[in-house]
Amino acid sequence: MFSFVDLRLLLLLAATALLTHGQEEGQEEDIPPVTCVQNGLRYYDRDVWKPEACRICVCDNGNVLCDDVICDETKNCPGAQVPPGECCPVCPDGEASPTDQETTGVEGPKGDTGPRGPRGPAGPPGRDGIPGQPGLPGPPGPPGPPGPPGLGGNFAPQMSYGYDEKSTGGISVPGPMGPSGPRGLPGPPGAPGPQGFQGPPGEPGEPGASGPMGPRGPPGPPGKNGDDGEAGKPGRPGERGPPGPQGARGLPGTAGLPGMKGHRGFSGLDGAKGDAGPAGPKGEPGSPGENGAPGQMGPRGLPGERGRPGAPGPAGARGNDGATGAAGPPGPTGPAGPPGFPGAVGAKGEAGPQGARGSEGPQGVRGEPGPPGPAGAAGPAGNPGADGQPGAKGANGAPGIAGAPGFPGARGPSGPQGPSGPPGPKGNSGEPGAPGNKGDTGAKGEPGPTGIQGPPGPAGEEGKRGARGEPGPTGLPGPPGERGGPGSRGFPGADGVAGPKGPAGERGSPGPAGPKGSPGEAGRPGEAGLPGAKGLTGSPGSPGPDGKTGPPGPAGQDGRPGPPGPPGARGQAGVMGFPGPKGAAGEPGKAGERGVPGPPGAVGPAGKDGEAGAQGPPGPAGPAGERGEQGPAGSPGFQGLPGPAGPPGEAGKPGEQGVPGDLGAPGPSGARGERGFPGERGVQGPPGPAGPRGANGAPGNDGAKGDAGAPGAPGSQGAPGLQGMPGERGAAGLPGPKGDRGDAGPKGADGSPGKDGVRGLTGPIGPPGPAGAPGDKGEAGPSGPAGPTGARGAPGDRGEPGPPGPAGFAGPPGADGQPGAKGEPGDAGAKGDAGPPGPAGPTGPPGPIGNVGAPGPKGARGSAGPPGATGFPGAAGRVGPPGPSGNAGPPGPPGPAGKEGGKGARGETGPAGRPGEVGPPGPPGPAGEKGSPGADGPAGAPGTPGPQGIAGQRGVVGLPGQRGERGFPGLPGPSGEPGKQGPSGTSGERGPPGPMGPPGLAGPPGESGREGSPGAEGSPGRDGSPGPKGDRGETGPAGPPGAPGAPGAPGPVGPAGKNGDRGETGPAGPAGPIGPVGARGPAGPQGPRGDKGETGEQGDRGIKGHRGFSGLQGPPGPPGSPGEQGPSGASGPAGPRGPPGSAGSPGKDGLNGLPGPIGPPGPRGRTGDAGPVGPPGPPGPPGPPGPPSGGFDFSFLPQPPQEKAHDGGRYYRADDANVVRDRDLEVDTTLKSLSQQIENIRSPEGSRKNPARTCRDLKMCHSDWKSGEYWIDPNQGCNLDAIKVFCNMETGETCVYPTQPQVAQKNWYISKNPKEKRHVWYGESMTDGFQFEYGGQGSDPADVAIQLTFLRLMSTEASQNITYHCKNSVAYMDQQTGNLKKALLLQGSNEIEIRAEGNSRFTYSVTYDGCTSHTGAWGKTVIEYKTTKTSRLPIIDVAPLDVGAPDQEFGMDIGPVCFL
C-alpha cells in the first residue's frame, strides 16, 4: 500500500531538487549590490547588525528590517545571567546543561531573576596611526579565490539523510555571542595608489601666452554620475555572507510541496492535562457526606387541589369603617343668633387679579419737542441754475511746459575730416574657418626633453569590465576579521517547560451583559418539611411535600444482550461548517427616528445701530397701572351716628373665628364640590391598623454589588451549549510569512541617472499576497504553543442581522451610564404604586408671590378667638327676633324654586382641625419620581456556596480547540474491566433547609391566608407632596347629613298669643311632614313683648315661619365643648413604612412558585471530550538565530530529559515501524468502539451502561424481548442517574417500584378520642409512618424524582394499585351503613387527594373489597387508580378513617406505578 509517508517523502525530494536548481540559477546572475543606511552607518544587502542588545536588524533589498530578540527560556538553569551587552540570559559555566545529564529530577519552582552582572572592562584602545597624505583610490584588486560552496542550512540534514551517530555524545553547543568591543581609533591611512592613466585630451583653448604652471587648484565638485557601463561578465560567486537576521514577515508564498518525512522527534514535554476519560464504573459508595448546601428553589409545582380546611384562625383585626350611610332628613332650623359686635378692621386683602384692559383713552397733550435727530443722508442733486453773467478778462497765464522735439531737419553738408583715432581693442575670435585639407606628414622631430610630470588627470569614466584575470597567487592570510554579525535564525528550539503560573490578574471590569441564557433545567424539588401538628379535618388541603426516600433495594442482574435492532433514526447533525462568504449587502435600513432637538445656539453678537427712523404717531393710552398699596391707616375716628341702612354690600371677608355653635341637625346632602386644594398639614394621626398586603412593588434599584460569595461547589458537567451561529467575519489575518525570493527578472532599460535620494523610512509591510494553491493536507502536526494574543483587528463589515440568539444568562448590573439626552415625552404611563416618601429636602428660598389661586373650599370652623374689646354702642338694631309661634295658618301654595346661590368667597385658612381617626387606606398615589440610588449598602456577607447544578445534556461537538502544547505520546492502555457494583451507601442525613430561593414569577392567586395579627404601630409618616388634581370622580356614596338647609320664606305673622305657664317638657312628638312653603304675608303689627313664659307643652309641629331678621351679634361666648366626632376625613398621604409587625401565625403552605429566574452560570464544567485535531496553528514566533551555515548542527535543540541514553539515530517516527503498527491497531480499536457506541445509542439495550429512555422505546427496538427488569434513563445525558424499572413488554408500560413496598400489619395509631373518627395520614401523622418513595434499592431519591418528572412528561396515562390489609377497619364500603363515608383517602404526588366518591376525576375504584365490617379477622381491599393526569401518580400517602381503637390494625402493599 502506498502510504501517506511515502507520498510525503517523494514530494520533499522534489521540493529539494527544485530549490537546489533555483539556487544554482540564482548564482549565475549578477545582482547589483544594494545598501541600507541606519543611524549614519551603511550596510550591504543581507548584512545583519544589532543596534541595541535586544534588537537585531537586517538589510533586505535596501530596506532595514528590525525585530526584537526572543530569548529561550532557561528553565533548567536557576542562576542564568544576562552578559553585558547581550539580551538573553545564559547559564554560568558551572551549571549543568540539559544535554549533559541523562535523567533530571522533578523540576523545581522558578527561581528569582539573578542580579545583573557587572559590565566587563573596555578593551585597550588601539595605537594612534601617523596621519598620512590622502592617497588616491587604487584600482579594484583581483577577485579573491572562491569560497567553499555552502549548503543551505535548512537542507543540510535532509540532504545528508544520515546523522553521525558517534557525534551525539559531544554535540557542541555554540557559545553566546560576546559583547561588541568599543570602537577603535581610526587606523593609519593607506599608501598612495599608483599613477592613474592618462586622461583624454581636452578641447583646444584659445592660444594665450603660456604662463608658468600655477599651483594645484582645489578639487572641483564631483561630476554627475556617468551612464552605467555595460554589464561585465559575471564574477565568480563570492563567499557566502553571514546569514541575515529573520526578515520581516513576508507575504504568504504558495504552499510548498510536503517535505520528506523527518527523523523521529524527541519526546515532547509533558502535554497539557488530557481530557477527562470516559466515566469509570460507579465506585464504592462513600461515607455519608456532610449536609449539602441548600438546594436551589425547585420549579413551581402544578397547582394542588383544594386543601383541607385549617383550624379556625384568631379573631381578625378591626375592619375598616363602613361606607357613609345615606343622609338623614334635614333637621329643624335653629334660632337665629343675636347680632355680634362690630369686628376689628380686617387685614389688608390680597391684591386682586389684574383687570381687563380699559378702553382707549383720549389723545394726550402734545409732547415736548424731541432732541434734534442725527444728520440725514445727502439728498439728490438739485436742478441746474440759470446762466450767470460773463466774467471779466483774466490775467496772463504762466509759461507752458516745453513742447515735444520737432521732426528732424534736412541733412546738412559734410564737415571736415577729423584726426585718426587710436587703435581699437582686439576683436573677438572669428568663427572657426572651414577645416583645411590634411597636410602631409612632417618629418619626425627630435624627442624633446622630458617635461615636468603633470598632475594626475581627472579620473576617467569607468572602463568596461576587463576579461576575467587568472587567479592570483594565494595571498598571505589576512588579519582575523571583525566579529561576524549574528547568524541566520536557526530552527525554533523545542518548546520549553511551562513556566510557573503567573499571579492572578486584577479583577476585570464587568463585561457587557451577555445575551439572555436559555432557561435552565428544572431544579430538584425541595426536601419534605417536618410534619405539622394535625389540624381539624377540613376540606382538601394543599398538596403535601414529597416523602423521604426509602432504603434502596438490591440491584438486579443485567439482562442478556439482545439481537441487533433495526437501523436507528438519523444521527445528530454534524458540526457546523465554517462561516460562508459574506452575503450581499442588505437593503438600506429604515430611516432613523427624529433626533432630539439640539441645544439652543449661542447668542449672536449685537447688530450695528440702525439709523434713526422717522418719528412715529403717538401710541394708544397704556393700560391702567396696578393698584397702589394701601396707605397707612388713619387714627380711628369716633363712632358716628348710625346712618340709614345702605343696599346690601358684597359678601365681606370671613370674620374671625366665631364661637362654636351647638352641633346643628344634619342637613340634606349637598352637591359634591370640586376637589379643594390640600389643607395645611394636620397633626400627626395615630397609626392605623395594618392594611392588607400591597401588591408587589416595582423592583428597587440594584443595590451595590455585594462581596463575592464563597465559591460554590463545582457543579457536575453542564452540557456544552448548542453551537452558536457563525460570528461576524473576522478582520483580515496577519500577513503570512515571507515567501521565497523570486528569480531575478530580465534587465530593464537604462534609466536616466537620478541623484541619490535621502533614504526613506522603512515602508509598512505590504498587503497579503494572493492565496497560494492549496497544498496537500499534511499529517496533523503536534500542537504548537499558543501564540501571543494578537492586536485587535479592525471591525469587519457589518454582517446581515443574524437570527436572535438564545437567551443568555443575566449579566451583572452594568455601571451607571451617563444621563442620556432628554427624550421626547412618552405617553402617559399607567398609574404607578405609591413610592416610598423621599427624604425631606432642605427648606427652599421663599418663592415669588404666585397668582391669585381659585377660591378654596370653605375652611373648617376655627376655634374660638379671644374676646374682642367692647365696641361703641351699635346702631339701632333691626327688627327683633320673631315672637312666639302663632297659631298655624292654612298651608299656602308651594312657592317657586329658588335659584342656585353663587359660590361663596374663599374663607381664610382655618386653624388645623383635631386629628381625625385614621381613615381607610387611600388609593395608591401616583408613582413618585425615581429617587436617586441610595448609597451603597455595606457589603453583604459572602453567600453560601450554591448547590451542584444538574448535569446538562451533552452538547454538539464544539469547534476545534486551540492547539495544545505537544505532549509525550503515551500508548493507550487496554480498557479495564468494569468494576463490580459497590454496596449501597447509607443514606445521608437530611440537609438543613435551603435558603429562600429567588422570588418566582407571580403564581395564580392562592387561597386567602389566615388573618395576621395587627402590626405594631408604625412611626408617623411625613406629608407627601400634594398630588396633581385628579380627574373628576364618579358620584360618591351618599355623604353624611349636610348642614341645615336654608330657612324657607317666612309665613304670615299670627296674632300674638297670651303667655302660657311654663309646662313641663313633654315627650318629643313625631316629626310631621314638611308642609309646602306659604306665600309671604304682610307684616303684622308688632305686639308688646311679653315676659318669657315657661316652655309650654310641645305642640304639633307648626308651619315653618318667615325668616326673621338677623339679630345683633352677641359678645363672644365661652368656648363650646368639643363637638361630636366628625366623619372621617379624606385619607391622608401614605406615611412611611412602619417597622415590621410581629410575625403572624404561619399561613398555609403556598403553592409552589413558578420557576425562578435562570440562576447565574454554574462553575465551569469538566473539560469536554477532545475535539478533532484543529488545522495547523499560525507560524510560531521566529526562533533564535541559527549557527553559521555549513553543516547542520542539532546541538542547539534542548535535549529532553530521557530515561535511556539518547539514541541520535532515531529522530524520526517513521524510522520505527512498530509505532505505525501500534497506531493502526489503536485506530481500529477506537473505530470499533465508536461504532459500537453509536449502535448502542440507536438501539439501547436497557442495561446499566446503555439504558433506554422508556420501556416503550425498548419494546419498539426489541419487540421479542420478555417482560422483566431493565434500566432506563428518561432524562438522557449521563447514564449514572439511570434507574431500574420493570418493563411490561406486552403493553410497553414502565413500572417503578416503591423503595419500601410493604407496610407491616399492626396497630399503627391509637386515638385519644376513639369516638371522634377522622382521616389520619399514615406518613404524615402516624408514629413511625412514612410517605412512599420510589425507584428501587440503591437509587438516589433526587435522581428518581427527576426521572419520574421526565417519565410523566413522556407518558399519556399512569396507573397504580394499593392493597389495604385490615382487621376491624373499614377500607371502602361500610357494610353497616351502606355508604363510603369511612373510605380511605389517597394522596397523589402533586399532593392532590384522591377519594372514594365525589368528582369522578379524583376518585379511585376498588377491584376487591374485603374490609367492610369489624369481624376480628384480617381481610384486604384492592384499590386501583388510573388517570391521564400523570402528575398525580405515584401515590405517596394513605389516610384511613376507621382506625384509632386498640383492636383496629392495618397494613398495606404498595404496588408499582406504571406509565404508558
From Swiss-Prot:
Q: Which residues form the VWFC domain?
A: 34-92
Every Fibrillar collagen NC1 domain range:
1225-1460
Instruction: List residues traversing the bilayer.
Output: none
The record places propeptide residues at 23-157, 1215-1460
Function recorded in the entry: Type I collagen is a member of group I collagen (fibrillar forming collagen).
Sites of 4-hydroxyproline modification: 186, 189, 192, 201, 204, 207, 222, 237, 243, 252, 258, 285, 288, 294, 303, 309, 330, 339, 342, 369, 372, 384, 390, 399, 405, 408, 423, 432, 435, 447, 456, 471, 477, 486, 492, 510, 519, 525, 531, 540, 543, 552, 561, 567, 579, 588, 597, 600, 618, 636, 642, 648, 654, 660, 666, 678, 687, 699, 711, 714, 720, 726, 735, 753, 768, 774, 795, 801, 804, 813, 819, 837, 846, 855, 867, 873, 882, 891, 894, 915, 924, 933, 942, 960, 969, 972, 978, 993, 999, 1005, 1014, 1020, 1041, 1044, 1047, 1116, 1119, 1122, 1140, 1155, 1161, 1176, 1179, 1182, 1185, 1188
Record's subunit section: Trimers of one alpha 2(I) and two alpha 1(I) chains. Interacts with MRC2. Interacts with TRAM2. Interacts with MFAP4 in a Ca (2+)-dependent manner.
Signal peptide, first to last residue: 1-22
Question: Where, subcellularly, is it found?
Answer: Secreted, Extracellular space, Extracellular matrix
What segment(s) does the record annotate as region Disordered? 96-1213
Query: Which annotated residues bind Ca(2+)?
Result: 1273, 1275-1276, 1278, 1281
Q: Where is this region: Nonhelical region (N-terminal)?
A: 158-174
Q: Which parts of the sequence are annotated with region: Nonhelical region (C-terminal)?
A: 1189-1214
Impact reported for residue 208 to A: In OI; severe
The annotated regions of Basic and acidic residues compositional bias extend over: 225-239, 1089-1103, 1203-1213
Task: Please report the name of this protein according to its UniProt entry.
Answer: Collagen alpha-1(I) chain
- The record's disulfide annotation reads 1255-1287, 1295-1458, 1366-1411
Chain intervals with Pro residues compositional bias:
134-149, 329-341, 836-848, 992-1002, 1038-1053, 1173-1188
**Comment field on protein domains:** The C-terminal propeptide, also known as COLFI domain, have crucial roles in tissue growth and repair by controlling both the intracellular assembly of procollagen molecules and the extracellular assembly of collagen fibrils. It binds a calcium ion which is essential for its function.
Composition bias type Gly residues, residue spans? 481-490
Q: Cellular component GO terms, alphabetically? A: collagen type I trimer; collagen-containing extracellular matrix; cytoplasm; extracellular space
Residue list for modification Phosphoserine: 167, 267, 783
The glycosylation sites annotated in the UniProt record are 261, 1104, 1361
Please list the GO terms describing molecular function.
extracellular matrix structural constituent conferring tensile strength; metal ion binding
Query: Which InterPro entries does this entry report, sorted A to Z?
Result: Collagen (IPR008160), Collagen_superfamily (IPR050149), Fib_collagen_C (IPR000885), VWF_dom (IPR001007)
